Amino acid sequence: MKLCHMILASLSLAVPAHAGEIWVTNEKDDTLSVIDTDTLEVIQTYATGERPRGITFSADFSRVYICASDSDAVQVMDPETGEILHDLPSGEDPEQFVLHPDDKHLYIANEDDAVTTVVDVDSRKVVAQIDVGVEPEGMAVSPDGKVVITTSETTNMAHWIDTGTHTLFANTLVDSRPRHAEFTKGGAELWVSSEIGGSITVFDSATQGELGKMTFEIKGVHPDRVQPVGFEFTPDEKYAFVALGPANHVAVVNAQTYEVEEYILVGRRVWHMAFDGDHARLFTTNGVSGDVTVIDVAARKAVKSIKVGRFPWGAAFRP
C-alpha cells in the first residue's frame, strides 16, 4: 500500500500543474499554432483552410472545429494528428460559431449572407438558416441551450434566437460594431462588446432589458484606439478580462459592479483569449505583433510573449 502511494505521489509530481494546450488560429498564415501551457512554447503548427478565425473543441476534445472564413467552410480536425477529417457546410464567410451544449449543433455567423447557419455535426447537414442583421459575427449560447445570440456588426444589434424553433424572439440595440457575446451568472446576464462604440453592454436575459454598460479609458491611449472585442470570465465570474484591440491592453473588470479595476499591457491589437486548465494564466492573441501574451491572472501582469503565426485571431484550450 505504501509503495502504491509513493508511485501515485511521484506521478502527481511528474504532471505539470498547467498541463494542456492553447490552440491559436493564424488568419494570415492559414495555420494553427499549438502552445504547450507548461513550457509556454509552440510545439506544433498545422495547416488549415483559408483565413482561420473562430475555433472550438467538441465536449470530449476529440475534434476541433475551425472557421476557415475564406474557404467558406467549418473544418473538422483530429487534434491528435492535425489531419483535416472533413468540412462542414457553413454558409459563406463563417466568422465565429458556438457549439450547443448537446455537442451536436454548431451555430455559425455568416458575415456575407446576414444569416446564422445551424449545422448538425454528425449528419454534416444544414438544419436551419436564420436571417439576422448585416455582418453577423459574435455568437453565444445560454448554459441551458435554449437561447443563441448572434451579434451583427452593421445593424448594431444582438439577435436572440430560440433554439427550439430556430426563430428570432428579440432584437436589442448595442453600440457600434458589436463583436463578441457571452452569457454569465447561469445565463441570467448577456454581455456584448462593441468595438467602435468602445463599450460592453450587459442585458437581463429574462427581459432583454439593459442592466448596465461599461466603457474604458487608458491614460496615454487615444479613445478611438480603445476597441473592446473578446472577453473571458474567471470561473467564479467575479472578474472579466476584456481585450481592447489596438489599445494593446486587457482590462480587468469587476463583473459585479461593472467597474474597471486595472489595465494590463499586452501585444499589438489584442483580439481574443483563452485560460489554461486551472485558470491561473490567460493567453491573448495579438494580431499585429503576431504573438500571444501570457498573463498571470493572480498577479494581473504579463509574464511572457510567445511568437506564433501572422495575425493570430482565435484561441481555445485543450487539456
Predicted regions and their residues:
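Positively charged n-region of N-terminal signal peptides that target proteins for export
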Residues: M1-H5
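Cleavable N-terminal signal peptides
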Residues: M6-I7, A17
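Predominantly soluble domains enriched in secretory-pathway, periplasmic, or organellar proteins
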Residues: S12, P16-P319
